[in-house]
Amino acid sequence: MRLSCPVVLLLLPCASAAGAQAAPNGYPVKPVPLADSVEIALAVSAAPPELSNQATVYAVRDGQVLTLRRGSNGSACVVARDLHGGSLYPICYNAEGARTVLARELLEVRLRSLGASEDSVERAVAAGYASGQLETPKSLAMAYMMSPRQVLFSSPRPEGRRVGAWHPHLMFYVPGATPSMFGLASEDAEPISVSGSGTPRAEVVVKVQKWSDGTPVAVPAKTP
C-alpha cells in the first residue's frame, strides 16, 4: 500500500535548490527509488525484529512522503538518504521517536530529494523547531541504526566521505545535550558520543557490538 503521508513536515516551505552545485565526486546525486518490497526490507533491517516487524515503514519519492506499510506498535522505519550517490541510512524509531524526531528526518530527506542545498535544509529544520512545527521529545526517544546494509557518509555536505557500513549503533535524543553532561571531553568520544551538541536535535550515539541480524562486529571501527 502506498499512501501520501500528511505529517507536519509537509506544511513547511520547500527549501530552494539553489546552491546545490556539482562537486568533483558527482555530488549532488538525487536518490534513486527502490522497489517497495526492497525499500521495506532495507528499512526494517535497521532494528531487531522485535521492533521492526510491526513498525510502520515510510519512503520519500520526489518530495512526497509515502506510507509503504502500516504498523501496529507505534514505531517507524525509513531509509534516509542524502545527495551522495548510493547513500542508504536505514533507521527505525521507537514510538516517541516516531512521533517527534521522524518528522525532522523526513523533512530533511524530502528536501534533499528535491535537490535542496544543505544550508537550505538546515534553515528549514531550524525554522521548524523555532515555530513548533517540529517537536522535541517529551519522553525517551531513540533510533536504531543497526543495518549491516547501511551505506553512510561522514557528512551530508559535498565534502562528506563514504564510510559504508560503519558500525551498528543506537541514538538517544536529548535536546540540548552536550558532552560534558555525560562526563565526556569531546563530541567524538568512544564508545559514546554526542552529535548536534547543544541543539534541539542533540543525540547521544552509543555503539553496539552486533548488527540487527545478530552478526557480530568483526573489526572495531573509527568514528567517521
Write out the residue ranges for each language-model feature.
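Primary mode marks residue(s) on the alpha4-beta5-alpha5 output face of response regulator receiver
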Residues: 22-224
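N-terminal signal peptide c-region/cleavage motif recognized by signal peptidases
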Residues: 13-17
